[in-house]
Design a protein with these regions (language model features):
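A structural signal for small-residue-enriched, beta-sheet-centric alpha/beta enzyme cores
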Residues: 14, 28-30, 229, 238-305, ...
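Flexible, glycine/charged-enriched surface loops at secondary-structure junctions
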Residues: 55-61, 72-79, 133, 221-228, ...
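Contiguous, small/hydrophobic- and glycine-enriched helical/loop subdomains that border
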Residues: 185-232
């Protein structure tokens, strides 16, 4: 049995193992990481011998941690990474190569439909009616999408919403409010089995799932880095943010919105920027906290979208997929029963 895990921003760890009487046997740990002293690897391997094959990645990481001595140095690898590689070797955790993906662009829909599809399409994937996928959003009107647990009145300036005809939606994931005008943002949703991030903390899962898009940004000459917990940023400010929701059905949505351009005046008239966030970010201006991609590249939004689409398709051998009329009808129905309802948008307890 063979499993691999590449630590985001780190090194590759490889585990080979057999299982005898439901326990690990003949475990081998290797990779391009660095350990000091050399015998730390022997101790790590020995700690895994005889471990129950049903052990979680967390339990396996604890075994590795216990085998380390004070002063041991691990570079490019963590005990958690070893645990994930073991789980992958046992077939309990998935890698990207284990998943047959679709890649989808669009269609252009009313703002709230995209938010609803981040729930309805997860249900389709879990039921086997659709493959896991990466979907690039398109929408036909200005919107603000607030996080699942945010207060409408604390995040939204109603006068600005009314003035500019903005749709306010509440998504199924947590995180902060996003001001999203057509043509000024790039948003994608990734629907995957939670087994792809089995054993990872949220802090580990975010950069792991967005590693492919960081590669695209680098190719496009956009200097970006991941800032824990869930921000993509340049040295000048935030480019985008990610959010996730994991369902009990074994699937999850991970989505990211990145600023391509920004109407700073309009954003400040629509969103409220709380004093706690101002103090935390160290600036009095929401605008100064955002660094849209257009500031670093002269490429049109459409070219960046195509680069995302092509890179994901090539990297993960994805098939081009579509959103059907039936998918849209299901999403519209979900808007009527949930996402467009006042009690959802204005934070009723029905969704918690």
């Amino acid at each position: 049995m063979h499993g691999e895990y590449k630590v985001p921003g780190g090194k590759l760890v490889v585990v080979d193992t057999d299982v005898e009487e439901d326990r690990l046997a003949r475990v081998s740990v290797s990779g391009d990481f660095f350990l000091d002293p050399d015998d730390a690897l022997t101790r790590i391997t020995a700690s895994l011998e005889g471990a129950p094959a049903s052990s979680s990645a967390k339990d396996l990481a604890a075994r590795v941690e216990a085998a380390l001595h004070e002063g041991d140095t691990l570079m490019g690898v963590t005990p958690e990474a070893v645990g994930i590689a073991v789980r992958r070797a046992l077939g309990a955790a998935l890698s990207w190569d284990d998943i047959d993906f679709d890649v989808i662009h669009g269609p252009v829909v009313d703002p709230m439909i995209n938010v609803a599809m981040d729930e309805t399409l997860v249900e389709d994937v879990a039921a086997g009616r659709r493959k896991p996928f990466m979907r690039l959003w398109e929408w036909n009107g200005p919107q603000v999408v607030i996080g699942s647990f945010q207060s409408y009145q604390n995040e939204i300036q109603q006068d600005g919403v009314d003035r500019y005809g903005i749709t306010v939606s509440r998504r199924v994931t947590g995180g902060g409010a996003m001001f999203m005008e057509p043509g000024n943002c790039i948003t994608y949703s990734l629907v995957i089995p939670t087994a792809l991030v089995e054993g990872m903390s949220f802090e580990q899962a975010y950069p792991y799932l967005d590693q492919w898009v960081m590669e695209v940004l680098e190719k496009l000459g956009i200097k970006a880095k991941y800032v824990p917990l869930n921000d993509i940023a340049s040295e000048f400010g935030k480019i985008g943010g990610a959010a996730q929701k994991r369902w009990a059905n074994g699937y999850m949505v991970h989505h990211v919105t990145m600023a391509y351009d920004i109407d700073a005046i309009k954003m400040n008239e629509v969103l409220r920027i709380g004093m706690e966030k101002i103090r935390d970010k160290g600036t009095r201006s929401a605008v100064k906290r955002v660094d849209p991609m257009r500031s670093q590249t002269g490429l049109p939004r459409e070219e960046i979208l195509q680069a995302f689409f092509d890179h994901f398709k090539e990297k993960y051998n994805a098939t081009v997929g579509t959103i059907t009329d039936e998918d849209l009808e299901v999403a519209r129905a979900r808007c009527e029963t949930k996402f467009a309802r006042e009690e959802w948008v204005h934070l009723s307890l029905i969704h918690i």
